[in-house]
Amino acid sequence: MIRSLHLTDVAVLLLFLGKSPVNEAKVRDRLTSREVELLAAAPLLRSCLISDDRQCSFICVSRGFIQALVSLKRCRGPGAWMVDRLLLSPGREELCRDLLERTGFADDKIKAERLFLRLDSSSPALDMAKQSGFTHYLTEHLYYLEETRQTEPPESSLISRPRSSADEHGLFRLYTAASPLKVRRAEGMTLQEWSQSRDKDATRELVLEKNGEISAWLRIRLGRTAGRFEIVTESGAEELGQLVNYSLAALKGRNPVYCLVSEFQQQLQHILEEQGFSRVSSYACLSKQLAVRVPEPQLVPLRA
C-alpha cells in the first residue's frame, strides 16, 4: 500500500532508516558528501509532525513495515518540486516504479506543475522512473580534482561581483543562450518557470560581466574540506580557462574540488581534463509533468 507519511509512522520510519536503505535520488547539495540515512530522520520526522507546504513524503507499507519512501521538496517556487530522497529497502527495488507513479498524483498535496529527479546514470531506478512518466532530458558529469594547486585570481577584463536579485533577467538571458532547447523545455521556457525550478543549494553565487553584460555565472559551494563549482557561460576556451582558474582560487584550501558539468559543455570538460580533473560520476536529470488542475466551468446569468 502506498500512502502519505503520517505522525503515527514515527516508530516504523526510524526502524526503516536504521536498516540503511539505498537512496537513489541525487540532489545537488549532497553530490559530494556522504549522508548517513539515519541522519535523514530529522527532516522526515518534521514532515510527520508539522504540516508543511515545502515538503511531503509517501511510503510503501507491507505488513506494517515501510519498504520504500519518496520525499518531495519544493524548489525555489511552488510550481516546481524535486525528489529529495528515494529510499528503497535492499531487494525491494521493484517498488520504485509504483512509488514514483504515485508522485504523478501528488498535485493534490503540493500544487506543482513539474517534478524533477536526478539519478546516477547506472541506477536501476532509471528505467523504472521512465516507465512511471519521467523524461530524461539531460546528463550531468561530476569531475574531481584531488589536489588543487595554489591559484590566484587571473587578470582579465572580466569583472566579478556577488549575484543580486537584480541579476535575474540577465542570468535568464545567459541561461537561455547557453542551454539547448530540450533542457529549457524541461526547466523553464519563461523567466518565471526557470526561476521556480532552480533548487535551493547553499552556494556562493558570482556573476562576471563584460561590456556591461553578464557573461558568466559561477556557483561555488564551500564544504568543510571539499569544494564544488559550476559555470554557466557562452565564453570561448580562453575565458573558460580563466573561469576555471577563478573558481579554483575561490576554493583555495579546499581538497578535493569537484565541478558539475552538463553534457553539452564539452569545451569545459576538455579544459577540466587538461587541468587534471577526472570524471567520477554521471547523472541522469529527469522531469515529469504533473497533472494541472483546470478550473471547472461555472454558469453565470446571461444579461439581456
Kindly give the residue locations of the regions a language model identified:
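Conserved acetyl-CoA-binding loop-helix of GNAT-fold acetyltransferases
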Residues: 91-107, 131, 236-250
